[in-house]
């Protein structure tokens, strides 16, 4: 089971408006994360609009007391800057970076979610208590990913699932 895809609440950018539900409305939605949100220097949406929307989503996450599920492409420095002063956990979705980038994220308190496309050295280096797994846009079942990651990390899929569940419920 892909635990990060449980009950994810989306906030979207439309034109120049960041469309977020009210706090009262959001509290009625059975959600656990705010996201997927973040910054992407490759997408067509102007970066300044993305930045404004992301800042609003961060405030929303803080106001509601919900963890933030983060999408980031080529914007690490801005994300690390914006993470300072926040209290809610952030989960980096689809991490493919090098161990040096992983270390930066861990130093800033991030949790890291890996999919089928990952850097093996980063996957090995990620502490178990900061690890999540996801299928995202691949058709393969999550059980295949658990088996692959368990082999790489020299554990069992069952132990890996227990750890990821513990991480999720600890957020």
Where are these regions (language model features)?
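Mid-domain alpha/beta scaffold segments of enzyme catalytic cores
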Residues: 1-171
